[in-house]
């Protein structure tokens, strides 16, 4: 939530781009479907690995606050994840060309975002540093503008960390970073 709010705050843009099938949490800022309390007119769902998606980002860049990418999508583009345990313990990463195809996709997405001045956000709340010591950025060799980490940072304890380029993080006072506590 903090990364999306921060992305929307900085450029004054409202539209968030998510990829089909990607999971970014259970809050109404990115979840569409039955039971949603509000219409998601500020969230756009595009297809992974599709050149049309890149064109949409280029054409609508002036409206887009950020593009969210969940690295788990590399194992099953445009579909919901089959099972969390299967994704991280199976040999699907080693026997499939999904890494190469998704790396190429992320590089093209990175270029489209940079050309449109749209922040690219890697949502690593689930994957964290499980794909590589340097996270998704190291695994795919593509730098994000902002990265979100979750429980993997704290050994399974509930925590969230948002990292980003200085100009994106300027909303936060370095002496008093945003803190949220739920009891």
Regions found by a protein language model. Give the residues of each.
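Conserved N-terminal phosphate-binding loop of PLP-dependent enzymes in the Aspartate aminotransferase
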Residues: 2-183
């Amino acid at each position: 939530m903090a990364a999306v709010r921060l992305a929307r705050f900085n450029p004054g843009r409202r539209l968030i781009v998510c990829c089909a099938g990607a999971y970014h949490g259970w809050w109404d800022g990115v979840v569409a479907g039955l039971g949603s309390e509000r219409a998601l007119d500020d969230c756009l769902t595009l297809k992974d690995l599709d050149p049309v998606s890149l064109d949409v980002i280029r054409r609508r860049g002036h409206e887009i606050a950020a593009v969210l990418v969940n690295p788990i999508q590399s194992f099953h583009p445009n579909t919901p994840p089959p099972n969390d345990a299967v994704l991280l313990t199976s040999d699907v990463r080693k026997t499939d060309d999904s890494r190469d195809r998704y790396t190429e996709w992320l590089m093209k997405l990175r270029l489209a975002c940079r050309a449109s001045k749209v922040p690219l956000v890697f949502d690593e709340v689930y994957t964290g540093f499980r794909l590589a010591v340097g996270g998704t950025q190291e695994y795919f060799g593509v730098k994000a503008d902002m990265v979100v980490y979750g429980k993997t940072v704290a050994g399974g304890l509930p925590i969230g960390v948002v990292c980003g380029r200085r100009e994106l993080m300027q909303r936060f006072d370095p002496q008093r970073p945003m803190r949220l506590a739920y009891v």
